Amino acid sequence: MLNINDINKRIKQRPPFQMIERVIDWTPGESATGIKNVCINEPYFMGHFPDAPIMPGVLIIESCAQLCSLVFDTEGGNPDIIYVLLKVDNFKFVKPVIPGDQLVITVTKTKIMGPLAVFDAVVKVNDEIRSKGTMTFTMVEKSKIYG
């Protein structure tokens, strides 16, 4: 549904920190399902852990966050707005993610409270849940951060 070029028009992250490579389902303002292919060439595997590489949990959360920002962005990639992760709740890592896995990440908006949006996230590999949790975001104008 969205390829890497389409995604680049809507989210701020870029390689090597861009985690979402393809979006296979997307309802703007509501939900999305995206793909992250986990490759042994990712720089973090050099140190986490060399003898038994595992994708760091914080990067799994970041993958979910990037997909949430795509859902939250209903303005079509406004260059003056940054979507900021404020809070992570009850994120559980059920089984490790290793090189060769393909993450299928689904995020669903569950609540809007003024400028805040709450999302549920589920990460699967081969239809098996690897992690899940809840995330809260807000929109911030770049000028309020950088002047």
Feature locations, PLM:
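Beta-strand-rich interaction surfaces with strong enrichment in secreted/lumenal proteins
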Residues: 8, 51, 93-95
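Short loop/turn motifs at secondary-structure junctions and domain boundaries
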Residues: 14-15, 113
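Short aromatic-glycine motifs in intrinsically disordered, low-complexity regions
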Residues: 2-14
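Catalytic strand-loop segment that frames the active site of acyl-thioester-processing enzymes
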Residues: 15-55
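Conserved positions in beta-strands of structured domains
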Residues: 21-24, 89, 94, 106-110, ...
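Hydrophobic beta-strand-centered segment that forms part of the acyl-chain substrate-binding groove
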Residues: 1, 68-104, 130-138
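Active-site helix/loop of acyl-thioester processing domains in fatty-acid/polyketide metabolism
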Residues: 23, 55-78
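HotDog/MaoC-like acyl-thioester-processing domains
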Residues: 29, 98-101, 108-147
